[in-house]
């Protein structure tokens, strides 16, 4: 296999890493490429693609607030900026660490609207999401505004991790917002199940921060309700059909006897009694 083929395969592993599991994927890659340890250092573009597409969040040095990494707030050269904190910073895509923080003030035609959206987003995100980050940035020569919400929920002790990503592109001149809501959940106890959804969004809005966030709230609430109905349908339909049926013996279960069994001996049948 050529070096380029190896890099392409390893890059696909990185870009497809489930939420909260990039470090595990990197560890596996290092084990697979132990004979060429420097190969991981050549996968920078894959790490950048993952971080920007997954809206990776990072805490700036000396701050407790998370900021977002995306193509919409990139300044080039692995530097990004955040409107709410009026800062720009360097970001290492491999280690996912921020550094070299500088003051960065957003101005221009959509500057006030962008700040208005962020002000309205703050209480909405705080009320409806845990461990979430949000942001808004002028894009396309200051003609539109990109709005992002990302919420992460990691529960490795229970063998699942999940991420919610919302991206909306606001066109103030047209009075429209277009985008998508993506949900990625990985469950890996006694199996490997991954839920990936992509919901396109189109709506008409007034060009005020409060009105825009009100529409976002309505769209996201409706989609969450749709997801809940889909989960219930899967549980009672496809997933139920996959479950192994318990045998019907028509015999009473002796619960007291079962409670007295010694795990690994009576139930497992292993080892002699002491």
UniProtKB/Swiss-Prot annotation:
InterPro entries: CapZ_alpha, CapZ_alpha/beta, CapZ_alpha/beta_2, CapZ_alpha_1, F-actin_cap_asu_CS. Pfam families: F-actin_cap_A. One of its GO terms (biological process) is barbed-end actin filament capping. The keyword Cell membrane does not apply. It is found in: Cytoplasm. Transmembrane segments: none annotated. Keywords: Actin capping, Actin-binding, Cytoplasm. Its main location: cytoplasm. One of its GO terms (molecular function) is actin filament binding. One of its GO terms (cellular component) is F-actin capping protein complex. F-actin-capping proteins bind in a Ca(2+)-independent manner to the fast growing ends of actin filaments (barbed end) thereby blocking the exchange of subunits at these ends. Unlike other capping proteins (such as gelsolin and severin), these proteins do not sever actin filaments. Belongs to the F-actin-capping protein alpha subunit family. Heterodimer of an alpha and a beta subunit. This is F-actin-capping protein subunit alpha. It comes from Chaetomium thermophilum (strain DSM 1495 / CBS 144.50 / IMI 039719).
